[in-house]
Amino acid sequence: MSTSIGDNETGAIVSNENVEFSVDFRGNPSIRSSSGAWKSSGFTMCAEVAEKFAYFGIASNLITYFTEALGESTAVAASNVNLWLGTAAFLPLIWGSIADSFLGRFRTILLTSSFYIMGLGLLTFSATIPSLCNDQETRESCVSQVKVIIFFCALYLIALGEGGFKVCLRAFGADQFDEQDPNESKAKSSYFNWLYFAISIGILTTRLVTNYVQENLSWALGYAIPCLSMMLALFLFLLGIKTYRFSTGGEGRQGKKHDNPFVRIGRVFVAAARNRRQTPSDTCLLLPNESTKKFRFLDRAVISCDSYEVEEAKAVLSLIPIWLCSLVFGIVFAQSPTFFTKQGSTMDRSISSTLQVPAATLQCFISLAILVFIPIYDRLFVPIARSITRKPAGITTLQRISTGIFLSIISMVIAALVEMKRLKTARDHGLVDSPKATVPMSVCWLIPQYILFGVSDVFTMVGLQEFFYGEVPPQLRSMGLALYLSIIGIGNFLSSFMVSVIEEATSQSGQVSWFSNNLNQAHLDYFYWLLACLSSLAFIFTVYFAKSYLYNSPK
């Protein structure tokens, strides 16, 4: 009996030519030669390009909309941006659980894309609502409350859709590669590199096009373009449906395949606590021969949970130290669309007497660095490293992550030094009390920190994707990628929290805060130095945990 997409958790394996634990869109066993691998992931990558064009068309210049169109202060605007980015990056944990437990990745992609498109449409509508005052009045006192309410509803509807779409699309794309096939297994490592390459194309394009439209034509048009792009993303994804492989989630868990992964993992910890008085000899006979040797205290749970659930809990628990260390990188990651952008808005951005570069467009250098460095990494660095280390990926994923964190430290140091020079230039030209004046210092001074930020992304972000996808059992891979994305989400929350606390602490007794609306009196340089110190601690701990980490599969 064949199965359908809606019931893709089941299926039969009928011959060696079929891909194990995989069916096509009609529910028949997937044929290796006509499905999956690059022919399928190409469609998901194209959908990623269009989706990232939409998302970063909103995210990269959002702080400008908050401060100029809605009249918010720099600190409040930065906090609002961080809260929204954090929500969008944290929601994959929930959607990943729903996809792994109930809907499956394909149906979750369809559902969340509808939320996404509705949110973008509503955002476009909110931007068409005019202000209630003339140019002489302050913007914040005359913005329509209806406009603000619709805007925030739209913004978080976008976050709801984006959070599920991206985690399931990435996991679905990786599912197209069969780990049991040597060639496809090797290609999967390259898949994460080229996926990030494709994503960067979408991000670069929208920063060049959409940000310019928003600041020079209209916000309504600047938000309508991302809405159309998201519609294109859904169309491109559906275009590849006949080539896709749909995971049947095999591996001996048919009886419990719809359990919520959080419930399963929690059940293991509860059972281990209840059976804490049991001796190892009481449980060793119940464990399979391939049981991992780490976190042996969880083996006691096998008395009331099955061995597969115990292994799932061990796999997730082993990721926690790396996840915690990576949160600091998430905080650093939050700075480019917020304070980096505001920093650039005060500097000389003129290309000619009539043309100025939007401050948000400087983020293009992050994307350019990624686009240039990923081919170098994949085609030059990896083969050389592979010949030395004999590892398929050249270096381990944790070595890759550690390298990226180290580069982020240098990026923060450079950002602090450039900000110190910008403040000195403002003082030298008597601009300290002129918040709207252009500091006579070229915005090109910011380019090195953006480029280094992009190179660190190639190491850390791609490494985190591959690490969290590969180190969890197959049935938890949406959740694995959700854990990776939650690093960015919680990093944004932590950044927002830090900004609020520092703003409160440094503005007492009439002092000028680090994040004053007048950036010529503020001290973003102090904040960057603080992040450099925190990143240094994160780097030390990551290297420590990387040395003792036991991979679930050869790296």
Swiss-Prot record:
Expressed in shoots and roots. Its main location: membrane. GO terms for molecular function: dipeptide transmembrane transporter activity; low-affinity nitrate transmembrane transporter activity; tripeptide transmembrane transporter activity. It holds the Pfam family PTR2. The chain crosses the membrane at residues 53-73, 83-103, 109-129, 148-168, 190-210, 221-241, 315-335, 357-377, 401-421, 443-463, 482-502, 526-546. GO terms for biological process: nitrate transmembrane transport; response to nematode. Induction: Up-regulated upon nematode infection. SUPFAM superfamilies: MFS general substrate transporter (SSF103473). It is found in: Membrane. InterPro entries: MFS_trans_sf, NRT1/PTR, POT_fam. The modification Phosphothreonine is found at T108. CDD domains: MFS_NPF5 (cd17417). It is a multi-pass membrane protein. Keywords: Membrane, Phosphoprotein, Transmembrane, Transmembrane helix, Transport. GO terms for cellular component: plant-type vacuole; plant-type vacuole membrane. Belongs to the major facilitator superfamily. Proton-dependent oligopeptide transporter (POT/PTR) (TC 2.A.17) family. This is Protein NRT1/ PTR FAMILY 5.12. The lineage of its organism: Eukaryota, Viridiplantae, Streptophyta, Embryophyta, Tracheophyta.
